[in-house]
Swiss-Prot record:
Identification of the protein by name: Probable protein phosphatase 2C 8
SUPFAM superfamilies: PP2C-like
Enzyme Commission designation: 3.1.3.16
Lineage: Eukaryota, Viridiplantae, Streptophyta, Embryophyta, Tracheophyta
GO molecular function: metal ion binding; protein serine/threonine phosphatase activity
SMART domains from the UniProt entry: PP2C_SIG, PP2Cc
Amino acid sequence: MSSDTSRRDHAAMAVREVLAGDRKVGTVSRSARRRRLELRRLGRTASAVAEDDAAKRVRPASDSSSDSSESAKVAPEPTAEVARWPACVSHGAVSVIGRRREMEDAIFVAAPFLAASKEAAVEGSGVAEEEGKEEDEGFFAVYDGHGGSRVAEACRERMHVVLAEEVRVRRLLQGGGGGADVEDEDRARWKEAMAACFTRVDGEVGGAEEADTGEQTVGSTAVVAVVGPRRIVVANCGDSRAVLSRGGVAVPLSSDHKPDRPDEMERVEAAGGRVINWNGYRILGVLATSRSIGDYYLKPYVIAEPEVTVMDRTDKDEFLILASDGLWDVVSNDVACKIARNCLSGRAASKYPESVSGSTAADAAALLVELAISRGSKDNISVVVVELRRLRSRTTASKENGR
């Protein structure tokens, strides 16, 4: 049996055991070590891959699933008209090259992102900025590059900084007051900020007409989530995806921009382009996504305008998954949420006591990557899991730690 087949069998077995909910503790040290080694060989990285120095100073970098300062607290039930929760209790990320020759994905995490982005901007300009009270919002993003990694890496460096600038400008301009009108205005401001951010970053990385042809053929999808105490804002451009688990139900927060999506096909054709079925539906027979950052040579058919979803948080919100199509091409929303939920609720911790992080968001992300590999994903695979409230009780955690 080949090593690839053996690896897929081990991953599939692990996933089946978690789905079955088998809580019996066996002698698993060897298999656990083997799974860890397999992930390392595949090039596993955790949320520390967000290499921005400012972000590292703001958030813990010692654990791939770094808990926030509120991670030891159970998210409170809403007690007022405008409910507030911790932005997140933990987050984790895994990004692997998979069966591709080159790594073109990039991920970024900054929590809280406004403070991290402010520090990065001040360092870049050399100008000191007054301290201000920023809302505790986390920034999470997956960028799936194509034609090379240049644009995805540029998005990782710039997207959160530009978005923070756009958000601050609109908050400075907003008026006082309260009520439904203000809430609606705030939603509109978030959509405007996201749209302006994507346009600016696209302008920075898209390449000019006189630029080298190679630079014009590089692009990246982008799915970005800003998680705050009151709401979740998701902006998507391309076929990466964001899915929320709410009360055990998978709720998509984005819609893939595929060339054969009826409204996207109509838009492309109205701009003078064509959607050709050449090894799958593609813009001009070339690109399998109808929106992206970069890809100057395919404009105006391929645009960088994101679709933005602004959703109020509830006490049923459990976790958020952001991932590239390396996961979504082989795993459905429902299955992904079931796997992550079982992991975060403690089933994986009792089954795999030597797990690197102990049934945290990073473990959930790693298990989803294993599942995608076992199902034959041929792409880079990047997964970010954001835990919004504790699914595992303190009693369960104490028993496991004292075992």
